[in-house]
Amino acid sequence: MLLLEGNDMWVNLKTSFVDIDELLLFLKGQKFSGYLHFEFSDSQCALFLQLGDVVNGLVALEEERNVGSRAVKRILVRSRQDKGGTIKVTQLPLQNMQFLSEAYGLSVRMLHKNLSSKYSNLSEFLEKLQYESFSGCIEVWFPVDDRHGIIFLEDGLTTAIMTEELLVDLKEGTASQLKFAESFINRAQRSGVQYNAFVEN
């Protein structure tokens, strides 16, 4: 699961020790903007907060990504019951959290796994998805430097691209945004990336 890097306030908190309700109440009082990243034995999850309020949740299983209020409820129940999980609390600027929460707006399931740009050209694959009015995301892995990225699509159009360092909103389609998208895709193709395609549920 890919999230933006930020200011890690707490790391490796144990769900066996931390009361998630008390933690969220404290963060609400602080008008905290950022996310809580949970790691469990079979999944990774995140709660997205803006000014102390939980606005979205993400449950990442091997072949699906679930978001929204049901994901939030699932995460809260799991963190109360599963004593083997860990939590990281990361602070981000409010605008970054607004972008991040919006980017993870669709629940998706895996459609194609372990594709390689060496054998399946990424640009041509994206053109095919555009023709099909595809909604979902492409998770990209750069094997050379072990970095990750995500290309978000709605109705065939690329709406955002995210790496660990930045999230670029492409909805306005300005010249600089389109140039960034083209540069990212070209770099991914040259780097021989591996990628998975997830389609909207």
Language-model features: where?
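Acidic, Ser/Thr/Pro-enriched low-complexity segments and adjacent helix/loop capping patches
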Residues: M1-N201
